[in-house]
């Protein structure tokens, strides 16, 4: 039986393993090695003597398989949100960017613009009202001066509508009327008896104002004591005339029916010595009280003319006064000459 068996040598098991990066290649290598090992084991069963050797080879093959190390890498995909275009489940705005800021800025700008317009309108209305009030006040003051300091006289004010339409019309008309007024005479130092009733009556019949050596025309400043010289005699005469006028207005029956006999003589207007043309009109005699050349025309020409011609002393006094007037010149004469040259 032993001679009939042919002893054959055991096939040599040669295993080769390779480490791959991916887990799939390692598993394929292991499966190939396992298949080859199974085929070797199945072939060993035919020979009993070689069992131990084959078992050692199988065990060495299994230890070799256990030493295989595998590596694997995980790749994470990127996450992208779904598109909102034509997606009913995602809400998207159709307005442009910054709409909220534009709306808020427009509201704030409108508020500031309204406040600015309101301020401009109120400022303009206030300016117009102030201008009208100023013109009205100036017109009232002007009219009160023209009416003698009484702003409540009849016809001193115009209609309010005419004031607003043309506030300067009344000024023009008043200036025109005042420029057409006649010149009033002034009273300086009257004769020896300044309290004569006949002379006072003559002065009452004429319009008189306070003595003003600078201005010849009456204006609204005539009642003010702005001049350098004020005649005390004139002050007394005015006070007496005002008292007499008040009595006459209270009792109109006391008015004289006929003027006095020497009315024409008394109606002679008093003249100033400063005017050159007035010197030629009437002779100037020396004052008997203050020894000055300021004098009116003689009051009684009819009765005193003959005495003046007959008495040589009076003629001498007149000559002396004329000589004094020729050589002496008062400061007011220089001032009057300057004013007349300006006019």
Swiss-Prot record:
Residues 269-280 have a biased composition (Basic and acidic residues). It comes from the Eukaryota. It is found in: Vacuole membrane. Residues 281-290 have a biased composition (Basic residues). The chain crosses the membrane at residues 101-121. It is a single-pass membrane protein. GO terms for cellular component: cellular bud neck; fungal-type vacuole; vacuolar membrane. Residues 45-65, 235-343 are annotated as: Disordered. Residues 254-264 have a biased composition (Polar residues). The keyword Transmembrane applies. This is Vacuolar membrane protein Kpol_1003p17. Belongs to the PRM5 family. Keywords: Membrane, Transmembrane, Transmembrane helix, Vacuole. The keyword Transmembrane helix applies. InterPro entries: PRM (IPR051009). Its main location: membrane.
């Amino acid at each position: 039986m032993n001679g009939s068996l042919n002893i054959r040598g055991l096939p040599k098991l040669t295993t080769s393993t390779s480490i791959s990066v991916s887990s799939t290649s390692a598993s394929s290598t292991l499966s190939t090695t396992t298949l080859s090992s199974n085929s070797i084991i199945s072939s060993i069963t035919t020979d009993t003597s070689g069992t131990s050797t084959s078992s050692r080879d199988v065990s060495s093959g299994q230890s070799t398989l256990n030493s295989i190390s595998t590596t694997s890498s995980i790749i994470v995909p990127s996450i992208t949100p779904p598109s909102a275009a034509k997606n009913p489940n995602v809400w998207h705005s159709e307005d442009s960017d910054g709409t909220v800021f534009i709306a808020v800025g427009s509201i704030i700008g409108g508020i500031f613009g309204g406040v600015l317009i309101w301020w401009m309108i109120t400022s303009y209305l206030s300016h117009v009202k102030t201008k009208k009030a100023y013109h009205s006040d100036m017109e009232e003051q002007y009219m009160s001066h023209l009416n003698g300091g009484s702003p409540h006289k009849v016809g001193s004010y115009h209609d309010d509508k005419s004031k607003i339409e043309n506030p300067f019309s009344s000024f023009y008309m008043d200036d025109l009327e005042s420029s057409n007024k006649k010149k009033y005479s002034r009273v300086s130092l009257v004769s020896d008896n300044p309290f004569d009733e006949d002379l006072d009556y003559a002065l009452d019949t004429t319009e008189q104002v306070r003595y003003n050596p600078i201005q010849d025309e009456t204006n609204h400043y005539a009642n003010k004591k702005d001049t350098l010289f004020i005649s005390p005699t004139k002050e007394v005469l005015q006070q007496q005339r005002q008292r007499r006028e008040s009595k006459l207005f209270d009792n109109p029956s006391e008015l004289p029916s006929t003027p006095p006999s020497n009315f024409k003589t008394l109606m002679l207007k008093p003249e100033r010595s400063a005017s050159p043309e007035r010197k030629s009109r009437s002779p100037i005699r020396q004052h008997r009280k203050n020894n000055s050349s300021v004098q009116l025309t003689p009051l009684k020409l009819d009765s005193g003319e003959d005495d003046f011609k007959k008495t040589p002393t009076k003629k001498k006094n007149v000559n002396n006064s004329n000589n004094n007037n020729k050589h002496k010149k008062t400061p007011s004469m220089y001032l009057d000459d300057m004013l007349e040259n300006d006019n």
